[in-house]
């Protein structure tokens, strides 16, 4: 994965996508945190409540436009930062490609990452179907890097089972220091 992303990364293997997403979010979240995602996000709809139960973070599910989250939606949620009565928006989770089959462009991902980082939030990409997004965006390593590491994504779950493997996913922390807690 270091070679694929063109830099040193911290990588951990998991059995399935739910485990990968839970591991990634747990490494980034603290008690009282919230994860911003779309209302159709896999972590919100299909993972049997594992992200909230295991991670202990509230999911804030926002209306998707063609399956996508917009930077303005992140900015709208930033009002809760520092308010003692609200879960603290700390992580933005996007899915690439989305549950609707749409693909975020590299520029869209970069805009989301920029908005999240401006508000002190980290960005998680559920990449169960990342190979499809890369294929739709040119099919090159450069396309993968443009929509992940170059755009500012902090952690990606890299799909194996939806891309032909019998079992297994990878959690890739694009900043190895962010992934230091992943091993625990």
Predicted feature residues:
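Conserved PLP-enzyme active-site core in the AAT-like
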Residues: 1-184
């Amino acid at each position: 994965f270091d070679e694929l992303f063109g830099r040193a990364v911290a990588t951990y293997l998991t059995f399935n996508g739910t485990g990968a997403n839970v591991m990634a979010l747990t490494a980034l979240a603290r008690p009282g945190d919230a994860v911003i995602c779309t209302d159709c996000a896999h972590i919100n709809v299909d993972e049997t409540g594992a992200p909230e139960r295991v991670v202990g973070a509230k999911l804030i599910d926002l209306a998707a436009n063609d399956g996508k989250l917009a930077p303005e939606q992140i900015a709208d949620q930033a009002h809760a930062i520092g308010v003692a009565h609200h879960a603290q928006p700390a992580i933005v989770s996007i899915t690439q490609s989305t549950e609707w089959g749409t693909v975020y462009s590299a520029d869209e991902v970069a805009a989301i990452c920029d908005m999240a980082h401006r508000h002190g939030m980290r960005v998680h990409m559920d990449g169960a179907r990342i190979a499809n997004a890369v294929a739709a965006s040119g099919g090159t390593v450069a396309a993968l890097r443009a929509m992940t590491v170059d755009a500012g994504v902090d952690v990606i779950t890299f799909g194996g089972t939806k891309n032909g493997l019998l079992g297994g996913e990878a959690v890739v922390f694009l900043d190895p220091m962010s992934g230091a807690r992943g091993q625990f």
